[in-house]
Amino acid sequence: MDITLSYCILLTLIVSTLGLNPCPGDTRGDRRCNHDPTHRVCAKIGIEGTSFWEFTGQTSWCGTSGDYGGPYGSLPRCPPAQPTWCICKWATARWIAGEGCGDEIQFDCEATDVCDLKASYQDFNVDLQPAHQCLEKKCKRQWDSCPDKAVKTVNIGRFIRL
């Protein structure tokens, strides 16, 4: 594969990550779901009756303050008016595996790092296949615009060796 194509694919990945919209209910940093390797999915978990907490084994922190610092750090996390949060890829997969991919599962596709999820197979030893299948359906435009998983892996490795 020529170097120009490798650079184009790398540039696409960078632009897709930097071009993420903020996840409105998240109060960490700039509110974008790209601040660490796992919190890449902007999902509505602050809505009443969500099954997210049940299927991920977590306790709801929505409506509480995390005191993260910065301009948003002391605001309530995933409040009812903005019930989204940058959730872990593993939590996304477990939630979908338990709930299915119906109307109960809602994502902000413009604020989700879909390409990162597409290129990931496991997160904290959790198989991400349920998340792949659901995001491919619910965030189809973003999913289809990502490089093929195999191509991304080969090109990133090749780019790093240069």
List PLM regions with ranges:
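Extended boundary segments
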Residues: 16-52
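Cleavable N-terminal signal peptides of Sec/SRP-targeted secreted and luminal proteins
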Residues: 3-19
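Glycine- and charge-enriched low-complexity intrinsically disordered segments
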Residues: 112-162
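Short alpha-helix capping/helix-loop boundary micro-motifs
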Residues: 63-77
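Short, Lys/Arg- and Gly-enriched loop/turn segments at beta-strand edges
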Residues: 92-108
